[in-house]
């Protein structure tokens, strides 16, 4: 079993499930697999990528700037 198969079986739940269904197809044994990492919580991921980004990063779509720095956010671009 290659190192890349071991690594993917640790981080990819779908790949791990396929490997456990038929380990011989991958030249592996189920007993040799390391413990997988915890699966990503989709609600937490959505919070950090959609909710926070929508309210914080994109709250000011236009800005006033002076040189390289934005110092006022009033909704108009100057």
Curated annotation (Swiss-Prot):
There is a cross-link at residues 60-77, 64-70 (Beta-methyllanthionine (Cys-Thr)). There is a cross-link at residues 65-78 (Lysinoalanine (Ser-Lys)). Residues 1-59 form a propeptide. Keywords: Antibiotic, Antimicrobial, Bacteriocin, Hydroxylation, Lantibiotic, Thioether bond. Maturation of lantibiotics involves the enzymatic conversion of Thr, and Ser into dehydrated AA and the formation of thioether bonds with cysteine or the formation of dialkylamine bonds with lysine. This is followed by membrane translocation and cleavage of the modified precursor. GO terms for molecular function: signaling receptor binding. The modification (3R)-3-hydroxyaspartate is found at residue 74. The keyword Acyltransferase does not apply. Can act as inhibitor of the enzyme phospholipase A2, and of the angiotensin-converting enzyme. Shows inhibitory activities against herpes simplex virus and immunopotentiating activities. Its antimicrobial activities are not very pronounced. This is Lantibiotic cinnamycin. It comes from Streptomyces griseoverticillatus. GO terms for biological process: defense response to bacterium; killing of cells of another organism. Belongs to the type B lantibiotic family. There is a cross-link at residues 63-73 (Lanthionine (Ser-Cys)).
């Amino acid at each position: 079993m290659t190192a890349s198969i071991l690594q993917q079986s640790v981080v990819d739940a779908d790949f791990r499930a396929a490997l456990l269904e038929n380990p011989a197809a991958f030249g592996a044994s189920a007993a040799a697999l390391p413990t997988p990492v915890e699966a990503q919580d989709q609600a937490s991921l959505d919070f950090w990528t959609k909710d926070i980004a929508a309210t914080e990063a994109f709250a000011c779509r236009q800005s006033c700037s002076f040189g390289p720095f934005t110092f006022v956010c009033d909704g108009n671009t100057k």
